[in-house]
Amino acid sequence: LLAADRPETDRPANRILDIDNPWARVKAHLLCGLGSALRCQCILLATPQPGTRIHVFGYASDLERTDVLYASVLIQMWHGLAGAQVPAWCRSARAWRRSWLLGFATAVISRVRAAEHAAACRATGPEAAAGSRTALVLADRSHVVRAEAERAYPLTRTARVTYSGSGYRDGYAEGQRADIGTGRVTRGRGRALTRAS
């Protein structure tokens, strides 16, 4: 609501980010999923360098929330993977770890999306003082971000995430336990992501 009354407090913005190896595609999946849950739009770009390049569009506050949450979850994801045991019968430890990471990321993204949906419902419900106004602001912000991304990249296609390996279920279970900051406000000054030069 503050952004609607005083647009100078929060403006649409975008940044191009480089996600380094190892596991760049999995990290990109996590970042894009969190960004989408927090009303940002992510476009994967071709790059000759190893890793993945992503152009992220969103309001400045949503970009910051995505950045802070991504940094926090990434640390938890690496910690969880370090403690995970690859089964002795597993034919490819790398495939098992990649599927574990995808399971973790998918669980976290799903939880953040559900938390954002619940927060929006509370803010726009009949008991909320400015419910209908909040709904309009959220819808307008989503429209503005989508239009900015489409203006920059009129032709895009949806990327599919696939995996092989049997670690997905274990990773998903660990992602269900990850701290996503539900119920508290987190602010951060540090940049977890590397801005492209």
For the regions a protein language model found, what residue spans apply to each?
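Extended, helix-rich structural scaffolds rather than catalytic motifs
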Residues: 3-197
